Amino acid sequence: MNWNEKPKSATLPPLYPKSQPPFLHQSLINQITTTSQSSFSYPGSNQEACMYPGNSNPISQPLLNIQNYPQQISVSDMHNGTVVASHTSVERITYANVNGPKQLTHNLQMSSGVTQNVWLNSPMRNPVHSHIGATVSHQTDFGANVPNMPALQSQLITSDTYSMQMQMIPSNSTRLPVAYQGNQGLNQSFSEQQVDWTQQCISKGLTYPDYRPPPKLYRYSPQSFLPDSTIQKQNFIPHTSLQVKNSQLLNSVLTLPSRQTSAVPSQQYATQTDKRPPPPPYNCRYGSQPLQSTQHITKHLSMEVPQSREMLSSEIRTSFQQQWQNPNENVSTIGNFTNLKVNTNSKQPFNSPIRSSVDGVQTLAQTNEEKIMDSCNPTSNQVLDTSVAKEKLVRDIKTLVEIKQKFSELARKIKINKDLLMAAGCIKMTNTSYSEPAQNSKLSLKQTAKIQSGPQITPVMPENAERQTPTVVESAETNKTQCMLNSDIQEVNCRRFNQVDSVLPNPVYSEKRPMPDSSHDVKVLTSKTSAVEMTQAVLNTQLSSENVTKVEQNSPAVCETISVPKSMSTEEYKSKIQNENMLLLALLSQARKTQKTVLKDANQTIQDSKPDSCEMNPNTQMTGNQLNLKNMETPSTSNVSGRVLDNSFCSGQESSTKGMPAKSDSSCSMEVLATCLSLWKKQPSDTAKEKECDKLRTNTTAVGISKPANIHVKSPCSVVGNSNSQNKISNPSQQTALSMVMHNYESSGINITKGTELQIAVVSPLVLSEVKTLSVKGITPAVLPETVYPVIKEGSVCSLQNQLAENAKATAALKVDVSGPVASTATSTKIFPLTQKEKQNESTNGNSEVTPNVNQGKHNKLESAIHSPMNDQQISQESRNSTVVSSDTLQIDNICSLVEGDTSYNSQIAKIFSSLPLKMVEPQKPSLPNQQGIGSREPEKQLDNTTENKDFGFQKDKPVQCTDVSHKICDQSKSEPPLESSFNNLETNRVILEKSSLEHATEKSTANDTCSSAAIQEDIYPQEIDASSNYTPQDPARNEIHSDKAPVLYLHDQLSELLKEFPYGIEAVNTREGSVGQQTTYQTSEDQTADKTSSDSKDPADQIQITILSSEQMKEIFPEQDDQPYVVDKLAEPQKEEPITEVVSQCDLQAPAAGQSRDSVILDSEKDDIHCCALGWLSMVYEGVPQCQCNSIKNSSSEEEKQKEQCSPLDTNSCKQGERTSDRDVTVVQFKSLVNNPKTPPDGKSHFPELQDDSRKDTPKTKHKSLPRTEQELVAGQFSSKCDKLNPLQNHKRKKLRFHEVTFHSSNKMTASYEQASQETRQKKHVTQNSRPLKTKTAFLPNKDVYKKHSSLGQSLSPEKIKLKLKSVSFKQKRKLDQGNVLDMEVKKKKHDKQEQKGSVGATFKLGDSLSNPNERAIVKEKMVSNTKSVDTKASSSKFSRILTPKEYLQRQKHKEALSNKASKKICVKNVPCDSEHMRPSKLAVQVESCGKSNEKHSSGVQTSKESLNGLTSHGKNLKIHHSQESKTYNILRNVKEKVGGKQPDKIWIDKTKLDKLTNISNEAQFSQMPPQVKDQKKLYLNRVGFKCTERESISLTKLESSPRKLHKDKRQENKHKTFLPVKGNTEKSNMLEFKLCPDILLKNTNSVEERKDVKPHPRKEQAPLQVSGIKSTKEDWLKFVATKKRTQKDSQERDNVNSRLSKRSFSADGFEMLQNPVKDSKEMFQTYKQMYLEKRSRSLGSSPVK
């Protein structure tokens, strides 16, 4: 079982042993438990048990055991280890093995190339199919489960195959021989490789990017991933089938891990590619692959009719071996051969024809020479031939596009049929649920149903979604290929199908059970016929009559064969047969519903692993495949049969859900299936589910919540008590099971580890997200689904979320799916990547849990799911922590994968983080009593409801409970940031969607929320803390909180890395989405404590991680910083914490934690303010850590908050006007509102408008008052700038509103006005310091503090900011004057004008769009407008020069940059445009100054800006989210640049910029965050907590660049010039993720920061070489670079320390006069160093990512 444990397929293998010991154990245990499986799996030939152990690949031996081929077993041990249940496969493999399977394998490898798909390791792949014969037979019902483990990996492979088809094809060739050679060794190594490869893919972004590259390869499929689930699912269905094959290949890979890992993926890919584009390649390949499907069936038949098959297997084996001996003949006669075999064995003919087909396929695969059906030859050869494989891929893509179109037509037809069925009555809600999802999820439903019927990816719940779909698509494509291969393979396949339908019309589904020989034959056929024919039915609703006839024949066969759902299955299938398209709808609905039930069972199976899995393989194979087909067409006919057949919906679901719930309850595979299906189903099903939970609550409750929910209205208590406890375990357990299934990678150790990550790349995180949300959320499902839809509409995970958007349209249709937490988990999980993902999570959980509420088992179920399921799902609950973390990890991994597809990926990433906060809050609440689950999800639902103003009154209190519970919990247990993240996300969505509505709702429920929230918080508080702590791992930030926890560690590592890589994409997504949550995500990166502010998408991960690492560690390390950070927090808090202050009394812990957490994070970068607030926040999150000065801030902010609240009339307007401006403000204020005010859902908006109102109010009111206006500008400008950056949509409105008022001079104002605000606010209130840590300030203050700390001015600034104010005023004015009016007047005016011009332009993204010359023109245009404003800002900032601490730092940097720009305008210009784009809002002052310094370089900077705008487009969100950090980074970069003096070309400069950003940002931010006293501690902190601190910051940075990991490779070239912050983020991400550069950078940064303190230029120069190497180089380069670094540092230190250090020191103190010479020196030295480094880099890193 070692292999199982390693790939963590052990969970699935236990699943399979559970349900189908003979078959699933054969396939799974063969696959997973090699020796154990042999004796267990194949009772038919126990002799092979010995052989099986003797057989290095016991996988094939059980089949051989069944086949009684001990001799061949040993011969085909290796292959037959893979050919677990494949007589044919065993024969072939035996033959191949006997005949030299390695030879054949290599022949297949080389000759087959792509025929690897066609069974390049025809023996191996037959074994895989043989294994998948059992697996596919079980994958026909639970075959998905078996393939799910391997198929998940295969899905990874498959996904990889999409993008890496060419890659994987060679890998297949390479790994095929290895697989064949080292079956045993590879067996374990395969699991390792699978896991590693999966992780590889995940880390490489292959998980989803590979899946996303298929959009490139199969553009329609991934793009259709959501909308065209059918094709993508078809792609995945072929994947699943192939993955089922690959599962057996994985079994082979168990035997042949290296080959199987790559080869199976490649085979899978090729085969899937063939099957995916069945028409061109599948014609030939389909000959192979349908035959492979036949091999599936044949092997399944072999496995399932072990003894009677044994003889036939022997005969067929002999004949096939003969045919193998004559592969060319077989290849030419594959169709005939299959027909021959089919004719030879009528029942067995299917085994034999299938085997013949399999053998023929293998023959074809091996001998592609003649005609691998014309396409098969190229295909198999193309597996190795990359060019041919590419051509094949092109063909396949075209075929898939055709399939997509056909599926779209089918979806339309099915939708129409569903609508008709919905009109018919029972299907109304279900059909509504599926009508839209049918189009979007129709294919996925079909494919999922087919996946479950054919491949039955039941166990892999996450994988099921994608992987089942691939299997179904594979089947569909195989079926289509069969249809396309009508002359060849469809004759065979259709003959096979016809014979299967005629000969085994019942066995087709009978085979879904480990039944008699025909049953096994049919099972094999069903895995193929179900997969293929169901796919035919799905693929061809047009062909649905024929296919449905086949499926109908299969339906009766299922009825016959399936013992439990047999009669009902017959009825259902008869009903479905009556409705062929309805059958397809039923397939879709069943796919969704049965998959929900099967996923429940699969979850249970995963939870109950082996018994349930095996049970579910018989049950969910019978009942799983039948419930997949039947329960997928029966409960899913309850769902879709609700659509398809009311009778079938009721009786079918009752019978299916009765038969199935017993099995569903007994095995979670149905849940897993259902969850996977739900994943692939549209998340709008949440709304549909809500309605169906209301409407079909008795019927559909089980359908949605527990897949057999119609029967389980009581069964939702039983199936939702069992299945819904399991569905709550589908929420918790399905969360855990989904988590387990999806994340059992880490937790349960299922093979789905890889496939899930890859396949459910988008879905899986969402599933986890939603499952997390689902567990607690059932209170207000009705309202949320609608809100969920906007989320769906916002941005889909690739096509998935587009599908979800369509599903949002098909709210009613999706309501059935929404009924099930599995579906809602899967569905809303999919949706949750969107900003409303949390809403959707709420909605999904609400729907899912509304059904439990209807079932009245929601909380009981939650508790039983959380507690009772903890028995089965105690691991699942841990899985939920670790698995949810896994979920997050998967999410992030998936998102990381998606990150490559940044565009379609971004929105979802943002919303994954949105849902992650909710996840964090919701899982917290699942731990909490029902109150909290209701309260926590309900508030978010209320946010949605508030948006809708639906159940506002009902949810008014609960949102309060939930909100403040979440806040309080968040405050105490870091639940607050996640919840606030969720709320911010929800609020962002809500603000975006229904700002005024939410404002009204906010105002309505503010008092109630405040009161009941405070009360409930305290009630739920401890539990929520526990839930928060328990659930923390689920959130990336929570992961960081629990990063020290063992379960979380692995996931946390992945999540941390992924978050580092992933949030980047989130930012880009958010910016593009223009959603508040995304903007808040930006601020989370910027204001690491602003995570509450920006807790939208990134907060949960960024904010929590940052807070944990920053606040907690700073608590530990910098407790002293509490006061000072608090003072700084006060600066920012006049605006931000004013709303907090009101709520602070109620949420004192929350308010300091929330308000100051963000501010103190800002101040943490600036000062140690983050520690005060973060300390308070951490105190609240973790323990009663003193609130630092949050109470003072609260007191002072209470007044302002009250004032702002008094401005509530303006709130709505300002929320409307300034909400976009206030997106950042909302981020800033909203978290505080969320954290502080129990009226978070409303108050978040209330305070958001209030803050904005305050700032807007102050803008007209105190516009002439420098502080109010400055503060106002700080709030508006910072947030405006950031929001403008973040939300182009909102920015345009906001731009006009605020950019002219406060926006981009607000960046300089933020530097100037910010400082003014800081001064005045400090003078007025000590709260003003909170204003300083405003998001923009976060970047500036840390840098400025570091800078000032480095400079004499900054030394007193950090410790005492009041002193610093005065000193900063005088000193900075001095310095401004010293630096010349260039900085104070010229630079300020000039660059401020430029900055405002840029800001206005950049805010409107004119700068991004016309950054180059138009940007300059726009800047000239804006000069008048922004000049006036900048004059005001300058007046304010001149008035309060003291507050120039941030600005002084910026100016200092600008001055240095001006000098360095003068020295090297190119580099500086590039920095400036990057700043304009990346840090445009927050770095605008820096930008403006540097731009003002060099207008010339603006043109070159324009190019860079264009580049960085290109990067911004892809990284725009990433870049924009990190305005503060970008400001930090940019300031650091500027300092570095100034120190470098522009010597370094852009590349090196960018490398330096990246590393300097990293080091400067992390160091400066960290050091800035600490007072000078703490700086030494900070150094210790860096050393001690450097990793975590960097993680914390890296998480911010990670959020900057989680997506850009690849982006920072691909776009690093751009970004090094274009996006300094993304570069920085990439650098830090690289440090954290890619190269583990964080520790090096942090340590280096510590030194650099120390030097920088003393000598700004030197540390930066020093850092620049350090970072240049580090960023550009990999770990090696860092290792190699140590010497180079030392050299360069020595040179830099010798030169720059003497020149730049002294001159820059004097420049820091005296002005930029001294800076120019050092800059020149540093420029020269840096040029020298650049050349040196470039040479070194070219040597060490010929392909450096930076270049």
Curated annotation (Swiss-Prot):
GO biological process: transposable element silencing by heterochromatin formation
Compositionally biased residues, Basic and acidic residues: 937-956, 1089-1101, 1217-1226, 1242-1261, 1689-1698
Biased composition (Polar residues): 261-272, 842-856, 1073-1087
Swiss-Prot/TrEMBL keywords: Isopeptide bond, Nucleus, Phosphoprotein, Ubl conjugation
Region (Disordered): 261-280, 833-856, 923-956, 1073-1101, 1200-1274, 1686-1716
InterPro entries: RESF1
Modified residues (Phosphoserine): 221, 1145, 1358, 1708, 1740
GO MF entry, a single one: histone binding
Crosslink (Glycyl lysine isopeptide (Lys-Gly) (interchain with G-Cter in SUMO2)) position: 216, 707, 1136, 1528, 1636, 1723
Coiled-coil region list: none
A single Gene Ontology CC term: nucleus
Subcellular location: Nucleus
Gene this chain is encoded by: RESF1
Modified residues (Phosphothreonine): 1240
Superkingdom of origin organism: Eukaryota
Protein name from the UniProt record: Retroelement silencing factor 1
Known function: Plays a role in the regulation of imprinted gene expression, regulates repressive epigenetic modifications associated with SETDB1. Required for the recruitment or accumulation of SETDB1 to the endogenous retroviruses (ERVs) and maintenance of repressive chromatin configuration, contributing to a subset of the SETDB1-dependent ERV silencing in embryonic stem cells.
Predominant location: nucleus
